[in-house]
């Protein structure tokens, strides 16, 4: 599951600068921790570049993983499976998570 990409089903209303609308998300939670929720990071094709927003390719389109907006979502919000990060992308997301949480 970790590193998998899913289409997110619509959830509660967003506020402020939170992402809204249809989008994909990357599962970033450890496979060793099974809960009714899953920690994900949404993606965006229009977000500004930042060292904590690694780029990945999804269906031939470059998109950014918004590690700065990672959150727990109920497993029922996971829609269709959309792919899996490759080893390089997984490493870049891991680095961004460590940077965002200050655990480098």
What do these predicted ranges mean?
Residues 1-104:
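Conserved functional hotspots at enzyme active or ligand-binding sites that engage polyanionic ligands
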């Amino acid at each position: 599951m970790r590193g998998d990409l899913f289409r997110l089903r619509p959830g509660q209303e967003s506020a402020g600068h939170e992402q809204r609308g249809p989008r994909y998300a990357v599962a970033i939670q450890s496979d060793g921790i099974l809960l009714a929720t899953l920690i994900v990071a949404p993606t965006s094709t229009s977000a500004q570049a930042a060292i904590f927003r690694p780029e990945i390719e999804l269906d031939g389109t470059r998109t950014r993983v918004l590690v700065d907006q990672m959150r727990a979502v109920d497993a029922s919000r996971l829609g269709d499976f959309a792919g899996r990060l490759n080893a390089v992308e997984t490493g870049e997301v891991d680095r961004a998570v460590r940077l965002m949480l200050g655990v480098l």
